[in-house]
Amino acid sequence: MFGWAITFLVIAIAAGIFGFAGLAGTAAWIAKVLFVVGLAAVLIMLVMGRRPPTV
């Protein structure tokens, strides 16, 4: 998930350099969304992994 976010961030930067404003904005938005979703998934996995063992 973070790999995809970095990929779209690089696409956004490259598009911004070459002047494709619409594409840069869209790619940056996708990168932000994927980063937040990935971060939420990591936090959920950290919380779920700390359950006490059931006897």
From Swiss-Prot:
Pfam families membership: DUF1328
Chief location of this protein within or outside the cell: membrane
Topological category with respect to the lipid bilayer: Multi-pass membrane protein
This protein's record includes keyword Transmembrane helix: yes
This protein's GO CC annotations: plasma membrane
Location relative to the cell: Cell membrane
Keyword field contains Membrane: yes
InterPro entries hit by this protein: DUF1328
Annotated TM spans: 1-21, 28-48
Keywords assigned by UniProt, alphabetized: Cell membrane, Membrane, Transmembrane, Transmembrane helix
Tree of life domain: Bacteria
Positions of disulphide bridges: none
HAMAP family in the record: UPF0391 (MF_01361)
Family assignment from sequence similarity: Belongs to the UPF0391 family.
Protein name as it appears in the record: UPF0391 membrane protein Tbd_2772
Organism per entry: Thiobacillus denitrificans (strain ATCC 25259 / T1)
